[in-house]
Amino acid sequence: MEIIKDLPEVFEEFAEQRQKSFLAVKQLKDKGIPVIGSYCTYFPKEIAMAMGAATVSLCSTSDETIPAAEKDLPRNLCPLIKSSYGFAKTDKCPFFYFSDVVVGETTCDGKKKMYEYMGEFKEVFIMELPQSQKAEVLDLWKAEILRFKEYLEKKFEVTITEEQVREAVKLENEVRTSLKNLYGVMRHDPAPIKGHDLFRVLYGSGFKLDRTLIADEVDALTAKIEKEYAEGKREDKKPRILITGCPIGGATEKIIDAVENNGGIVVTFENCSGAKSIDRLIDEDAEDIYQAIAERYLSIGCSVMT
């Protein structure tokens, strides 16, 4: 696959992917395809993908719905949680509206309370995430993944086979590898592209409901960036900044702009919408694929585990 468009146009298309998928998710529902929504990178999407479901990240990146959320939740609660709950409560997130089930996880206390309230108007499946990454809790997390599999089988009256799970693992590994190779271009100094353009691809790819298309598109983009870099098209040499912490998107993209409008360049997103979600792969050849899935997800770096 070769990209014939200019890079700015490609970056803009990824930036618009979330809005494009509003219509796409309705079309999936009309076809009878299950939609599974989630808020966290600990969500083992391969299990849902194995049964042919579409997985989608739910809205939580604007302060627009916080006033509605504060009618139920404490005002001093994390704004990310209030935004998530507000979008859900007001039906302003099409992805939430069309989700057959929302998968929650026991990370922080605020999200636990959010899911409790959310369960009053939406079906929510809670995965009990161990608050540790010690080896002895791995069996507990594997059991939760199997419980999630059994829940999906019962709810949607399907059988999820090991072969289907392995196929989903292979597909998602390809997506992660492609995205990892993409942000690897930022090793160049000076950088080949702006950090905000990199972010648009990382963030927008999460809203592409057909996961089979992502790897080829991103690989082609990476090749084009490298080609243009070799031809001398690159940013000026600038201070290189790493962003870590909570997810970024929507209103919080102003953090990227604050850096890049003042002489710096963001070269890495070491957070939930960046490296944390794509750095580690699942061992496709593992004898016990569910154990491999559990190991991969439990090894994600998150402050809730410390």
Located regions from the model:
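Metallocofactor- and cofactor-centric catalytic cores in central/energy metabolism, strongly enriched
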Residues: 9, 15-29, 33-41, 45-46, ...
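Redox- and metal-dependent alpha/beta enzyme cores, enriched for Fe-S-associated oxidoreductases
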Residues: 47-61, 68-69, 246-306
